[in-house]
């Protein structure tokens, strides 16, 4: 049995005209987006002649073919074959009479499903799915048919919820433009296989399916929980006055960047069945926010490394100016690399490659853009490892610690743990794009654990942070006689 994932081949590749003037390009794109109506299928007619001549013949039946006329599906892609192996459709009447003589024309291309979901169907000997091409150009899809008599006398289904106790639907008819059909073979020698891409108005939800539960139910829930946790971290470091130093501002910014990435990934989950513009915009925002988070983490590591190397250490004296410098570095590098990645995707990446690597009907950021987005992240991780190793050596050489040294050491430990957690989550994100279900499930689990670990690292593990939270939240309690404030209370307690 063939694997039920098959990249359909776009027949009429359109070469987008590139304009050097940015304003003109933006205006043209706006006009095109407003004026274009969704077509029923991305296709072209194989024979010469005008569309008027084709539509004027009432006996001519248009058949939507996935590949070119001289191609069939071989191992998940369209390949050219000999003329003897061409796909010859067999038409069946509504009464079940097979091999009907019908005058037809091929319309090449996969269906433009729009908001509906494209779904691959295979018809081979012994399969539960049967594909029948009707003599008016419609495609009939039989499901759960046990024999041919049951197929011919099946009950039509509109994929709506049936009343309890009624019979299950046995077939559904797809109009022209909502399907494409073709012949399929495999290198293992499986012949006489029919393949079709159909547009499902509503995919049947199987709540017992672990894949559906993990990807469409638990994954969005995990993203929502992560958004709440990151918001809590950002609020704590932004509201408490004693935490609003340079390190606190950096942690707040990293939390906000990760919030944007989680929100963009959540949008990607729910836009797989909608306009490709929303999907690719969410893809770009996801990569942009992750890149910004790692540049800010790199700024955090540089600050700690430079402070430990400096002999004259003064905290919170020029934090505002330093934050401006780090902001210029982090946001400037992020914006530059993001602009290069977007430019490379739209203008340098091959059009055929972008058409072959899609999620359903949605265009995604290509590997060229991903490399430009994520190569700097790999570089910042390596630089941060250098900061960690050299700073660790400097800490081991110290024999005397004061309050400032304890606080710097606590910040160094927080930086190290954040680097470890964020790097592991980033690696699993990359591996999840390798089209392997196991890696995707691992990424969902790791992404769900990332933000609770960050909450522990940045808040729960920091005793002075929990002390400030208790002092701020429990303001109605009578003041303790031993309460000397945050700075004096932890001057020699080594609670950082």
From Swiss-Prot:
Transmembrane intervals: 220-240, 247-267, 277-297, 328-348, 367-387, 412-432, 439-459
Key words of the record: Cell membrane, G-protein coupled receptor, Glycoprotein, Membrane, Receptor, Transducer, Transmembrane, Transmembrane helix
Listed GO MF terms: G protein-coupled receptor activity
Cytoplasmic side stretches: 241-246, 298-327, 388-411, 460-496
Entry's localization field: Cell membrane
InterPro entries attached to this UniProt entry: GPCR_2-like_7TM, GPCR_2_secretin-like, GPCR_Mth-like
Membrane topology: Multi-pass membrane protein
Extracellular compartment residues: 1-219, 268-276, 349-366, 433-438
Source organism superkingdom: Eukaryota
Sugar-bearing residue positions: 82
Swiss-Prot/TrEMBL GO biological process terms: cell surface receptor signaling pathway; determination of adult lifespan; G protein-coupled receptor signaling pathway; heart morphogenesis; response to starvation
One cellular component (GO) term of this entry: membrane
Keyword tRNA processing part of the UniProt annotation: no
Keyword Transmembrane helix among record annotations: yes
Main location: membrane
UniProt family annotation: Belongs to the G-protein coupled receptor 2 family. Mth subfamily.
Protein's name in the database: Probable G-protein coupled receptor Mth-like 5
Source organism of this protein record: Drosophila melanogaster
């Amino acid at each position: 049995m063939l694997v039920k994932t098959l990249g359909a081949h776009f027949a009429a590749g359109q070469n987008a005209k590139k304009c050097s003037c940015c304003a003109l390009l933006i205006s043209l794109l706006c006009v095109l987006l407003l004026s274009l109506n969704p077509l029923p299928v991305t296709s072209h007619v194989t024979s010469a002649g005008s569309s008027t001549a084709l539509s004027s013949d009432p006996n001519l039946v248009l058949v939507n073919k996935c590949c070119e006329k001289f191609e069939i599906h071989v191992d998940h892609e369209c390949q050219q074959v000999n003329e003897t192996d061409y796909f010859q459709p067999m038409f069946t009447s509504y009464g079940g009479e097979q091999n009907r003589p019908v005058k037809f024309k091929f319309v090449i291309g996969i269906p433009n499903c729009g908001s509906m979901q494209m779904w691959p169907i295979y018809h081979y000997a012994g399969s539960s799915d049967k594909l029948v091409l009707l003599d008016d150009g419609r495609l009939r899809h039989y499901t759960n048919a046990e024999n041919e008599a049951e197929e011919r006398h099946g009950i039509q289904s509109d994929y709506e919820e049936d009343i309890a106790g009624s019979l299950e639907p046995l077939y559904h008819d797809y109009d022209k433009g909502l399907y494409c059909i073709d012949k399929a073979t495999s290198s293992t020698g499986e012949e006489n296989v029919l393949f079709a891409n159909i547009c499902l108005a509503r995919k049947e939800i199987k709540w017992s399916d672990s894949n559906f539960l993990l990807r469409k139910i638990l994954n969005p829930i995990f993203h929502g929980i992560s958004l709440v946790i990151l918001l809590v971290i950002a609020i704590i470091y932004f509201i408490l006055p004693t935490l609003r130093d340079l390190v606190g501002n950096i942690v707040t910014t990293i939390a906000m960047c990760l919030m944007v990435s989680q929100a963009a990934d959540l949008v990607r989950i729910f836009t797989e069945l909608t306009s490709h513009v929303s999907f690719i915009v969410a893809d770009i925002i996801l990569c942009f926010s992750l890149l910004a988070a790692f540049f800010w983490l790199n700024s955090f590591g540089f600050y700690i490394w430079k402070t430990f190397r400096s002999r004259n250490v003064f905290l919170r004296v020029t934090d505002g100016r330093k934050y401006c410098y780090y902001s210029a570095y982090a946001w400037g590098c992020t914006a530059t690399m993001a602009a290069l990645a977007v430019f490379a995707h739209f203008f340098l990446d091959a059009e055929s490659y972008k058409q072959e690597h899609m999620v359903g009907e949605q265009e995604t950021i290509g590997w060229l853009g991903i490399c430009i987005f994520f190569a700097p992240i790999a570089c910042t991780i390596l630089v941060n490892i250098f900061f960690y190793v050299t700073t660790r050596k400097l800490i081991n050489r110290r024999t005397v610690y004061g309050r400032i040294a304890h606080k710097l050491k606590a910040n160094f430990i927080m930086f190290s743990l954040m680097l470890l957690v964020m790097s592991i989550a980033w690696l699993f994100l990359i591996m999840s794009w390798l089209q392997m279900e196991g890696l995707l499930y691992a990424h969902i689990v790791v992404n769900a654990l990332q933000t609770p670990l960050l909450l522990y690292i940045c808040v729960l593990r920091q005793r002075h942070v929990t002390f400030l939270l208790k002092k701020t939240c429990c303001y109605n309690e009578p003041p303790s006689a031993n309460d000397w404030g945050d700075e004096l209370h932890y001057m020699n307690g080594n609670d950082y």
